């Protein structure tokens, strides 16, 4: 941080918008990602005791991670939070937009991590959800309708509580055995 702010300069708030804007592109992306994760974690944590959340969950040998695993009335969901600094949309089952790198595949990565974590924990995820800031998505939400990642959702952060209450698809239903799932996940989960 000192490389672009200046040596010997006191930094009161490292998330000050002026400092963030002056940072190199890669650092700006990491800061935006961290802020998006924090905002989503705070939102889910405020939903009440009907929800259990695990943050920064390690998958496999630790090469993959899921930002948030949420168990609630609508089932077990894998969430990742992102802020690409521009509007994004769903195209051919993947997130695309000016801020999304060509080799970046958020839905495919999250779905892969959720399937792998599900096998490790002996549970099944109801959906994979990519959460973006409200101004980062033109539609309230978009859902992958077909293909390998069918059911995955790209959603505005403000609508996440509604999704967590109602679920993504009537066919999936909630977890009637949520205490069993919670116990299984809690006993086997590993954190980054």
Where are the model-predicted features located?
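Surface-exposed interaction regions that form or flank ligand-binding interfaces
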Residues: 1-63, 90-91, 95-192
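Active-site beta-strand-loop-beta-strand hairpin of nuclease catalytic cores
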Residues: 71-91
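Short, mixed charged/polar active-site loops
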Residues: 63-65, 76
């Amino acid at each position: 941080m000192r490389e672009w702010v200046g040596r010997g300069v006191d930094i009161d708030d490292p998330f000050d918008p002026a400092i963030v804007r002056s940072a190199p592109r890669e650092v700006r992306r990491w800061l935006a990602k961290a802020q998006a994760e924090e905002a989503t974690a705070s939102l889910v944590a405020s939903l009440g005791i009907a929800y259990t959340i695990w943050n920064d969950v390690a998958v496999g040998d630790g090469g993959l991670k899921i930002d948030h695993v949420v168990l609630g009335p609508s089932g077990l969901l894998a969430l990742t939070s992102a802020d690409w600094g521009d509007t994004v949309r769903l195209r051919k089952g993947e997130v695309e937009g000016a801020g999304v790198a060509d080799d970046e595949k958020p839905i495919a990565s999250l779905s892969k991590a959720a399937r792998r974590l599900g096998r490790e924990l002996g549970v099944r995820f109801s959906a994979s959800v990519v959460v973006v800031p409200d101004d980062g998505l033109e539609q309230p939400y978009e859902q992958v309708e077909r293909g390998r990642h069918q059911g995955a959702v790209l959603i505005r952060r403000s609508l996440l509580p509604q999704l967590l209450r109602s679920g993504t698809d009537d066919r999936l239903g909630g977890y009637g055995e949520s205490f069993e799932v919670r116990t299984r996940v809690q006993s086997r989960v590993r954190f980054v």
